[in-house]
Amino acid sequence: MDRAAPLSIPGNTSYTIATNNFGAGVYPLDTNAAYEQNAADALGVTLNVTNNEFTADKSITQLQNQLASAPDGVAFLGISETLFPVAAQYCKNAETPYVFFACAPKDEDVATFEQDEYYVGTVVYSPQGEGAGIAELALADGCKTAVISAGASGDYAHDRRIIGFTEAFEAGGGEVLFVSHSADPSEGVQKTNDLLTAYPDVDCVYACGNDYVAPAADVVKSRGLEGCKIYGADISPNICQLIMDGEVEACSGGVFASCGVAITLLVNYLDGNVIKDSEGKAPYFDSLELFTVTSDNAEDFYKFLSDEALSTHTISDEEYQNLLVRNNAEVNYDYYVDFMANYAENVYAKVEANANRA
């Protein structure tokens, strides 16, 4: 089949897509998987999902096993930059189209992938931009000094959030006093306590992931540090509650949308409706605009994210379906860019509409 030529594909066409959850039981990763599943359900495709059990090597060995069953395509979550070239080579050898999501390969690796006819593209967000946005909020709130609580060094999202926050905070006249890394979330309380023992007068804590926000709030509250503000990433209902209670100032969210959008990109490719950028290359989408939860909208977001029918449906079935060329002749590279750039505003509108119905 000439995958570069648009085809007329019936709406009930079904594909099997191999994908991976780096580790089940962790909110951000499980939410990634839920967004993929929702997109698959909306588009009528089947997912074959592995649990890598937080082991990078397993993501590759399990991918090999998945490829042996000849899926129609692969949507791969690479938790480390070193995994992408390996996964790409296995997919190429198996002549299986593949898309990357959530975490991004190195630029030089992307240039290599672009020479591979089976490379569909990459759909990510900018964790560096995410961190910068939170830094701007902290500065606007009057913060001059900050400490950062993050996961282990090498974590794709956390490392880039740290860079983005630090650069923006210091460019705005603030100072990041220290960055603390926890080997796993269970160290969050102790590490934050150590931070605030060393820097008891710090203006704010930036917790770089969902699992580090509540521990920071607990420590600040237990130590009676009323002047210390907390900012976070990876919003969830419990963090919404902390914002409503005045224990957290703000938290970013929406990174999971890239997972569902990646499925649509792969399905378009499988349909023969290949999305290319202006240079004729496989697309690298990083325009996803994230939303921010503050005291102004925390209650509405809590209602939305606490509803199982809504929490992982910030993109509707109809929106997923309208990202397929088979359903919408207007879909092209620019359509995807605009869709992702407008994501946050669309979410705000859905959250507000849901609140008004309640």
Predicted regions and their residues:
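Hinge/cleft segment of the Venus flytrap/periplasmic-binding protein
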Residues: M1-T13, L265-A358
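Anion (oxyanion) recognition and catalysis
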Residues: D41, K92-N93, E170, M244
